[in-house]
Amino acid sequence: METTVRKQKKNLETKKPSIYSLQLHEMQDWLKEQGEPKFRAGQIFDWLYKKRVKNYEDMSNLSKGLREKLSNSFDITTLHTLVKQTSSDGTIKFLFQLYDGYSIETVLMRHEYGNSICVTTQVGCRIGCTFCASTLGGLKRNLEAGEIVAQVVEVQRALDESEERVSSLVVMGIGEPFDNYDNLMGFLRIINHEKGLHIGARHMTVSTSGIIPKIYKFAEEDLQINFAISLHAPNSELRSKLMPINRAYKLPDLMEAIKYYVNRTGRRITFEYGLFGGENDQVEHAEELAALLKGVKCHVNLIPVNYVPERDYVRTPREQIFLFEKTLKDRGVNVTIRREQGHDIDAACGQLRAKERKEETR
């Protein structure tokens, strides 16, 4: 343990910025400072995101001097895979270790339309949702843009073996994305850029628990990214019980921000609604939810919850899920039930990391 601590301390003291944190224009600016032509930025991005090399020596069309400058200035290492769990349905959950010893989760989900990745934006989470394993242990730190980018790069490297690609992504992993707004936006722009992994903006979804000021800010961004709200309750009292953030950002104010976003962007918003047995899954809850969303351009995604040992919530019975869905549909709400994936592995958000933390403290 003492050796591990010393190694992590050394990593912190000697850490260079990640090259994966740089957007193309930032790389061009750096090259200009080094007296190098800016077209080299495109070549560097090609090595990073198309060929996905792991060291600067492989960047054969760059001069030795430029490779040395890159090596002296930026870290090219990505993430260390601690655990890789594969479900019977093809879902793969990765537990990655960061340079400072913290760990994060990333999930690859396979669909008929392609491969989707769920990325993490923070080590832990401060929001405190009572149903989520991600909040166990609290928030440790924000991820850098490059650490979020590296999750996609590492998963894409795993897919390279079978000549597959990441075709879409959701920012719904550990942490509150809008609490790490600048790094989130840097990540999205790098991944979306044609010189990056070039995942289309409309194939990316960002989810928030409801940080209202950032919703207004997000509405002004120029990326056509899908937007989702973790709602989980049809009224303020129940939402405050499930999601303490509702005490700071009240549901009526949240709905006003959502309406502004929809009117400003013209885009439909998705409401994520986890179903918790006996808590928020009754017909009266569905009726109340339909009334809350009346007139809002939206889609509701019903989520049968994964069981989390550290929490007391139970799964809603299958027939009750269908009744909830029917109640919404009968009232004109666009709704679907999320297909469960990774049910036979630690699929709940933060669950694999929580298990690893338990092992570390034994």
UniProtKB/Swiss-Prot annotation:
InterPro entries: Aldolase_TIM, Methyltransferase_A, RlmN_N, RNA_MTrfase_RlmN, rRNA_lsu_MTrfase_RlmN/Cfr, rSAM. [4Fe-4S] cluster binds at C125, C129, C132. Its main location: cytoplasm. Binds 1 [4Fe-4S] cluster. The cluster is coordinated with 3 cysteines and an exchangeable S-adenosyl-L-methionine. Transmembrane segments: none annotated. Disulfide bonds join C118-C349. It is found in: Cytoplasm. It comes from the Bacteria. The keyword Iron applies. S-adenosyl-L-methionine binds at G175, E176, S207, S230, L231, H232, N306. One of its GO terms (cellular component) is cytoplasm. The active site is at E105, C349. Keywords: 4Fe-4S, Cytoplasm, Disulfide bond, Iron, Iron-sulfur, Metal-binding, Methyltransferase, rRNA processing, S-adenosyl-L-methionine, Transferase, tRNA processing. GO terms for biological process: rRNA base methylation; tRNA methylation. Residues 111-344 form the Radical SAM core domain. One of its GO terms (molecular function) is rRNA (adenine(2503)-C2-)-methyltransferase activity. It holds the Pfam family Radical_SAM. Its EC number is 2.1.1.192. It catalyses: adenosine(2503) in 23S rRNA + 2 reduced [2Fe-2S]-[ferredoxin] + 2 S-adenosyl-L-methionine = 2-methyladenosine(2503) in 23S rRNA + 5'-deoxyadenosine + L-methionine + 2 oxidized [2Fe-2S]-[ferredoxin] + S-adenosyl-L-homocysteine; adenosine(37) in tRNA + 2 reduced [2Fe-2S]-[ferredoxin] + 2 S-adenosyl-L-methionine = 2-methyladenosine(37) in tRNA + 5'-deoxyadenosine + L-methionine + 2 oxidized [2Fe-2S]-[ferredoxin] + S-adenosyl-L-homocysteine. Its cofactor is [4Fe-4S] cluster. Specifically methylates position 2 of adenine 2503 in 23S rRNA and position 2 of adenine 37 in tRNAs. Belongs to the radical SAM superfamily. RlmN family. Reaction proceeds by a ping-pong mechanism involving intermediate methylation of a conserved cysteine residue. This is Probable dual-specificity RNA methyltransferase RlmN. It comes from Bacillus anthracis (strain CDC 684 / NRRL 3495). The lineage of its organism: Bacteria, Bacillati, Bacillota, Bacilli, Bacillales. The gene is rlmN.
